[in-house]
Amino acid sequence: VGSEMCIRDRYIIKKNKYCLILALFILSFYLGRGVCALAKNTGKNTNSTVIVIDPGHGGSDPGKISTSGVMEKDVNLSIAMALKQLFENRGFTVVMTRTTDCDLAPDNSKHPKTDDLTKRTALMSKSNVAVSISIHQNSFEDSSSCGPQVFYYEASDAGKELASSVLGALNTSLCVANPRSIKPNKEYFILKKSTSPTVIVECGFLSNPAETLLLTDKNYQDDLAHAIYIGVTDYLAQSPSGHLQ
C-alpha cells in the first residue's frame, strides 16, 4: 500500500530493544525513509493454483549458522510456514517439502543430501505445480553483506521472470538502498532438476549480526513472507501459462 511506511521503519518502531543497532544497520545499508509501494492483490480465483514451498535444509543439515548460533534451517522453516499461511488464506493449494525439522532422505541413505534434494525436486516437478519457492538464508565472509537475493536456473525464461518479480517485491517492500540483481545459476540441484518455474530466495545474510536479528524476528519474517507472496502472485497474474485463473 502506497501510504505504508517501509517495513524496516515499522520494524524499528516495534522492536525498541534493538533500536540502536538496527537504526545503525539501516542507515548504513538501506534507505530507512520514504514510502514503499506494494503490489496489489489480483482478486482472482486461485483455487486451482498449486504452489510448492521448500524450506531449505533441515534435520541433520543445519545450513548456514550465524556467529550467535542461529541455524538457517530454523529461519527457513519459520518464513516458509508464514508464506504457506498467506497462500492458503488466498485459496491456493500449497505443497510443503517439510513442515518440521527433518530432511527427506531415507534413514539408511548412503547419499542423504542427494536423496533429500531428489525428493524435493520430485514434488516441484509434478505436472500441476505453478511455481516452486525454495527459502534459504545467505552467508558471506564479509559480515557487512546484507539484503535479499534470488537465484533461478539460467536456461529457464519462466524462472527468470519469477525471480525478477520476487526480488522486485522484496527490494520494494524492504526499501533496499543497493539492491542485488537476480542471479542465473546452472549448478544448484533443485534449479537444474525442477520442471516447474523455480527460484531460490535468499532472504538475508546470517553472517551479518544485525541482519540476523531481523531474520529471527517473527514480525520481520512475516514481512518477508508477504513480499515473496506479492512477487509470486504478480508473476502468476502476468504469466502467459494462465496459472492464476
Where are these regions (language model features)?
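Short, Lys/Arg-rich N-terminal segment immediately upstream of the first membrane anchor
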Residues: R8-K15
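Catalytic-core regions of hydrolytic enzymes
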Residues: A37-I51, H57-L162
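Active-site-adjacent substrate-binding region
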Residues: G159-P184
